[in-house]
Amino acid sequence: FALDIKNAVEQDGDPAGEKFVMLSNIIKVSAMHRVSDIYGPIRYTKFDDFETTGEYDSQEVAYTAFFAELEDAIVGLKSFEGATQFAPFDMSALGGDIAMWRKYANSLRLRLAMRIVKVNPSLAKIEGEKSFSSDAGLLEATDMYINTGFAHPITVISGSWGDIRMGAEMESILEGFDDGRKEVYFNPSDDPALNGAYKGIRMGIEIEAKGQYLGHSSIGSVIDGETIQWMTISEVWFLRAEAALRNWTGAGDAKTNYEKGVKASFSQHGVGGADVYLTDNTKTPKDFVDALNPANNIAYPGDVKIAYNTAGTNEQQLEQIITQKWIAMFPDGQEAWSEFRRTGYPRIYPVKVNNSGGKIDTDIQIRRINFVQDEVNTNGANVTTAIGYLNGPDNGGTRLWWDIPGSNF
C-alpha cells in the first residue's frame, strides 16, 4: 500500500498522472495523520524509499505538510472533476468520483484544523475557514469507507479471539441515554445471569480468568464485512458544530449542526427516533455497576444531557458535542481517543489498576504510544532526535504537540 502511494507520488510532473498524485496525497495524509496522532513525530517530509534509517519531522512540521498537501489536492483536482479513470481502482465508498474526493479532502482538512485548535488557534481558524469557503464543499451525503478485501480487525479480535467487549463508558452513556444505537454497536450479553442486558467492562480491572467476562456484550453489526470507516457525515456535522461554537466564519449554527450530526449517525446505522431523542433534556449517563465484582462499581463523573443547551457555557456545549461525536465515531477508536485527548470529553472512568509505574496519569490516561523498539534499534540516532521534539520522555504519559492541558476556550 505504501509502495503504491510512493510510486504514484513519483509520477509528479507527468500530466497523465497528476490527478493520481493528488489523490495519493489525500490517502497519504489520511493514513499518516493517524500515525502522527499515535506517536507524535513521524518520518514524513524526508521519507525516502524504504531504508531503515531516516529523519523525523516534529508533529508541527508534519501537520504543516498535511495542510499544504490537502490544499494542493482540493484546488488541483477541480479541473479533473468528471474524469472516470480512477473509478476502477477506487476501493472507497466514493466510487472514483473526483468531486467526492475533493469533499473528503476538505472535510479531512477541517478535522485536522480542529485537532490543533488549542496549540495554534489562529492557524486552526484559518484552515477551518478554508474548508467552509472552499467550492469543494464538505461530506454531506456519503460516509467515507474503505473496502479492504479482508475481515475487519475488530471482527477478528472480538469474535475469533474474544478479546474485546463493550466498555463501561459505552454502557453508561448508551444505557443512560436509552440510545438505540447500542443495538447496532453491540450484542446483548449471552451470560444467562445477565438476562440479555447490554453489559460493559471497566478499563484496567484485574481479570483472573478471561472467561469471566466473555458473556458480556460483544461487537454487533456495526462492523460490516470488509469495510473500514475513515470519516462519517456525522463527524463533519460535529466539526461544524464546534466550529460554530468557536465563531469560525461559515460554520453555521452550533445547535443545528449538532442535531444534524446526531441524525446523520442514527441514519447511518438505520436507527429511528432521532427527533424524539434530541428533545430529551433529563436523561444522563448512568453509573457503572460491574455484574461480577462490585469493587469495580463507579459513579459516572458528569451529568451531560442530550438536548442541546444553548444557554450553557462553551465548555458545557462542547461536552455535549464531543460526547455525541464520540458515540457516533464508533468503532473508530483512533479518532475517539484523539478527541478525548484534545478536549477531555467524554468523561471516562479512571483505570482501576495503573501498572505504568507512575509514567501515565490514572485520570487523564495514556496520551501516546512509545516509538517501536525495532525503530529504536535500527534508527536510534534519528529516534533520539525525534524524542527531543516531544514535550517529555518517550512514554505513554507524554502529551503530543496539539495536546494542551487546561480549558478548551
PLM regions: where:
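Structured, solvent-exposed acidic/aromatic patches
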Residues: F1-A274, A311-Q316
